[in-house]
Amino acid sequence: MSPQEANDSNFKAKPFSRVVLECQNLSYVFPNGNIAYQNINLETSQDELVAIVGPTGTGKSTLLRNLSYLIPPTTGKIFLEGKEIRHPSSSISLIHQSIATFPWMNASDNVKIGLTGQRITEEQASQIVEDMLSLVGLKDFADYYPKEMSGGMRQRIAIARALAASPKVLLMDEPFVHLDELTANNLRQEIYQLVFSTETTLDSAILVSHNLHEVVQLADRVYVMCGSPATIVDEIKIDLPRPRTERDTHFLDYLDHLLADLKPKCQV
């Protein structure tokens, strides 16, 4: 962490002690009998962003859906703060690859959808929506519709909606893949501090990405998935100060390390 971030009152400390989300011996078998992955063991710690990388077809996106229980795993257990979960929970939010906004709703209503099922008043809901839009820098665009916003703005709406339900864990499935590189890079620069702001309830986050530069830029730890059926073949801790830049030789060292680790194991 950079000295500037360490002194930022809006940025949480990083003790990396308490386990937040954990899965044990997780496996998933598709209805056709194909095994997506097997015996997956991973965990996230307090205020930690964990990345999952691996070739296409190794079940990374499926794993995120299993962790959120949108699709139950076939075998294994998932724990949130030490308690086993067996159904979808508002404590775990998932951002999909596609930029999911409802075109007939303005920004406020798109975020408000994330509060469906919450036992709160209309006034409380409106305040949460306003707070989340402010957090992602879109407070002045509350009445705008998706067609009036850029791809980056729409993705911010998706992030605000995911955070509105006060989750403890945020799962991100290739969140920048459909953005142009300039927009994606700008959002990457902000996402780490955004999700771990003291203004959110998040304790940890998991990112699935094929972009290794993105992974080194954002992740505290990386799990590598390979094989068929896929398993976790490596775990890499990335110990770099923030904000991170590719101009840093240590950044490039981690990138080379990750590439060298992936090639013989995954042939990518």
Task: List each model region and its residues.
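Short coil-to-helix segment of the ABC ATPase nucleotide-binding domain corresponding to the Q-loop/switch region
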Residues: 105-112
